[in-house]
Each structure stands twice: as structure tokens, then as C-alpha cells.
Swiss-Prot record:
Keywords: Methyltransferase, S-adenosyl-L-methionine, Transferase. S-adenosyl-L-methionine binds at residue 207. The keyword Transferase applies. SUPFAM superfamilies: S-adenosyl-L-methionine-dependent methyltransferases, Winged helix' DNA-binding domain. The keyword Signal does not apply. It catalyses: (2S)-naringenin + S-adenosyl-L-methionine = (2S)-sakuranetin + S-adenosyl-L-homocysteine + H(+); scutellarein + S-adenosyl-L-methionine = scutellarein 7-methyl ether + S-adenosyl-L-homocysteine; apigenin + S-adenosyl-L-methionine = genkwanin + S-adenosyl-L-homocysteine + H(+); luteolin + S-adenosyl-L-methionine = luteolin 7-methyl ether + S-adenosyl-L-homocysteine + H(+). This is Flavonoid 7-O-methyltransferase 1. It comes from Ocimum basilicum. Expressed in leaves. InterPro entries: COMT-like, O_MeTrfase_dom, Plant_O-MeTrfase_dimerisation, SAM-dependent_MTases_sf, WH-like_DNA-bd_sf, WH_DNA-bd_sf. It is an enzyme of class 2 (transferase). Belongs to the class I-like SAM-binding methyltransferase superfamily. Cation-independent O-methyltransferase family. Flavonoid 7-O-methyltransferase involved in the biosynthesis of polymethoxylated flavonoids natural products such as nevadensin and salvigenin, aroma compounds which contribute to the flavor of sweet basil, and exhibit pharmacological activities such as anti-allergic, anti-oxidant, antibacterial, anti-proliferative, and anti-inflammatory effects. Homodimer.
Length: 340
């Protein structure tokens, strides 16, 4: 190894060593609402004005903003003539970190009890969920504050961003759909967005009784309680979004069989919205995030995972689906159409 290669390798190692600092700084910026402030400003904002808005001393905030700018989370701009203050503006990345975008999801990953804290050597040796074993409890469900605020906000923003991508990049796929069941649809936000975009659809949100009991009425959406392991309401199209990555292959096959039973044999369709891991580990700009999500699922579920094309083909074939098509929706997830 030449000196240049060795220096590059050491630089990469240093960057990995400070990886948690990057997560912590971005998490802190979101908590201070810096991405939202820059977005609402509509143009460059001075360091002194930003300091007043977030309540952080200028000397400290300057160092945070310098770090964020280096990583593309803000942009340092030229100061107006006669001014010596620093000025910063939003970037495409900072817009993606606002509270109406992926900000809440990033907060979950950076939380003290979040998934990123769950990956340890000792935890990986466990036969159970590595993260739950390491923390001694299930952080996603046993802490009411964590569950009701951090976790739920993260899941909501993730669903909103992905549903918007589905509407924008797969809109034609909803033409002619009379009825659609969202299996594991929670409180119906995704289905509500779809029905609003495609008002001819009769939406059915299907989830466990305790979830349905808390759901508020939504125009065009009917709530039905039940278990996807037992049966699924009949419809033209069944949708599974962020569901199958929680379960083992055998459990997924059972769920898929129930979905197949609920759609017409000749015209029915199953829509799966989940990540697909590229076989060779490369892929598009979302490849690294998909691998990170896969490790997260290993930490917080018993046998959940993100699947490769081959693994998706296996569970779909075993469940009796004759063919499937993968649609790129320009998101972390893909949309898989499966036909009985």
C-alpha cells in the first residue's frame, strides 16, 4: 500500500470514528429546528439572527454550522457588503431534514434508546433481538413517551414521504382500482393520502383491534379490525407497506397467502412497498441507507430483514404468486406488484 492509499484509509477510519458525532450534530440541529428555520427564511440568514432564534451562543453555533456545511446540511453564503457576520442558507439535504420531511425519522435513529444504540458485539451474540437484549427492554414499545412521540413521529414522516413518492411515481397504477386494503395501515394516514389523490378508490384500513379502536374517522376510509395472519378483507388490490420486513420468511409466506386469498384470481394485485437490497451491494444512492435499515431490523426484530431480489422471489413464489414486477418509485423503498 502506497503512502497516499494509507493516508486515504486512515482518513476514512477517522471519519468512521467520528461517525456518531455527525449523527449527534444533525440530530441536535433538527431538535433546534435549524433546517426548518433556514427553509422558512427563504434565503440566507445571518449567524447572529440564527443564534437568537435557536438560543445558542454564536461562537458555538458557528462551529455547528461549519460542520453542517461541510456535510451539505447547510450552505455558507457570501455576506452582504459591509457585514462581517456569517450567513447560511438551506440545501436540498437540509430541506429533507425538516419536521414535515424526514427530520423525525432521523431523530429516532439518533435517540439514546433508538435503533442505532442497539448494535453492539454482545448484542449480536444473543439468540434474541440484539438491540432489545442489549438495552434490557424493548425501547420501541415499553417506553410510552418514546413510543407516542419519537417513534410514532418517525413512522408517520417515513410513511408520508414514501406515500408521496408512490403517488408521484406510480400514479397510473391506481387507475381502475375500485377497492384497496392497506394491511397494517395503522391510523390510515397512507390510505387517506391515496384516497385523496385517487378519489375513486374505496379504502379499507386493516389493523389489529387496539389500533383500529384509536383511529379517527377519515373521508373515504373504512377501518376494519383483524389479524393478517388469519384473514384479509377482500378487495381489488391489497397493499403491504413497511410490513413484511418485520417478519421471518415463513411468517411472510403466511401473510402473503392470506393476501392472495383476498384478491380476484384473474384481476387481483398485491402491492408491496418495502426496500430491496441489491445483490452485489452496490445499487443507487439509497443503497447505503437500505443496508442500514436492514441492520436496524436485525437489532429490533426477531427475524425481520430487508430482502434481496432473490429473497423476495422466494417468498412470493412459495406463497403462490405467479409473477411479480418491481417498480422504482425514486425512494428508499421499491413498489412490488405481485399477481396471483
Amino acid at each position: 500500500m502506497g503512502r497516499d492509499e494509507e493516508a486515504a484509509a486512515q482518513a476514512e477510519a477517522w471519519n468512521h470514528g467520528f461517525g456518531f458525532i455527525k449523527t449527534s450534530v444533525i440530530k441536535t440541529a433538527i431538535e433546534l429546528e435549524i433546517p426548518d428555520i433556514l427553509h422558512n427564511q427563504g434565503g440566507p440568514l445571518s449567524l447572529s439572527a440564527l443564534s437568537s432564534a435557536v438560543g445558542v451562543p454564536p461562537d458555538r453555533l458557528h462551529r455547528i454550522m461549519r460542520f453542517l456545511a461541510h456535510h451539505g446540511v447547510s450552505k455558507k453564503t457570501a455576506s452582504p457588503p459591509g457585514e462581517s457576520d456569517y450567513y447560511y442558507a438551506e440545501t436540498a439535504v437540509s430541506r429533507s431534514l425538516t419536521k414535515d420531511n424526514l427530520g423525525p425519522f432521523v431523530l429516532l435513529q439518533g435517540a439514546q434508546r433508538g435503533p442505532s444504540a442497539c448494535i453492539t458485539a454482545q448484542g449480536l451474540k444473543s439468540r434474541e433481538r440484539p438491540g432489545v437484549e442489549e438495552l434490557g427492554s424493548d425501547p420501541l414499545y415499553e417506553d410510552p413517551i418514546f413510543t407516542e412521540k419519537v417513534f410514532r413521529d418517525a413512522m408517520t414522516c417515513h410513511a408520508r414521504v414514501t406515500t408521496s413518492a408512490v403517488i408521484e411515481n406510480y400514479g397510473e397504477g391506481f387507475r381502475g382500482v375500485g377497492s384497496l386494503v392497506d394491511v397494517g395501515g395503522s391510523y390510515g394516514m397512507t390510505l387517506g393520502m391515496l384516497v385523496e389523490a385517487f378519489p375513486w378508490i374505496r379504502g379499507i384500513c386493516y389493523d389489529l383491534p387496539p389500533v383500529v379502536a384509536k383511529a379517527k374517522p377519515l373521508h373515504g376510509v373504512e377501518f376494519v379490525a383483524g389479524s393478517m395472519f388469519e384473514s384479509v378483507p377482500k378487495a381489488d388490490v391489497i397493499m403491504l407497506m413497511f410490513v413484511l420486513h418485520n417478519w421471518s420468511d415463513n411468517e411472510c409466506i403466511d401473510i402473503l397467502k392470506r393476501c392472495k386469498e383476498a384478491i380476484p384470481a384473474e384481476t387481483g394485485r398485491l402491492m408491496i412497498i418495502d426496500a430491496i437490497i441489491d445483490e452485489d451491494g452496490e445499487g443507487d444512492e439509497f443503497a447505503g441507507a437500505r443496508l442500514g435499515l436492514d441492520v436496524t431490523m436485525m437489532a429490533v426484530t426477531y427475524e425481520g430483514k430487508e430482502r434481496t431480489h432473490r429473497e423476495w422471489a422466494y417468498i412470493l413464489t412459495e406463497a403462490g404468486f405467479r409473477k411479480y414486477v418491481v417498480n422504482n418509485i425514486k425512494a428508499l423503498e421499491s413498489l412490488i406488484e405481485a399477481y396471483p
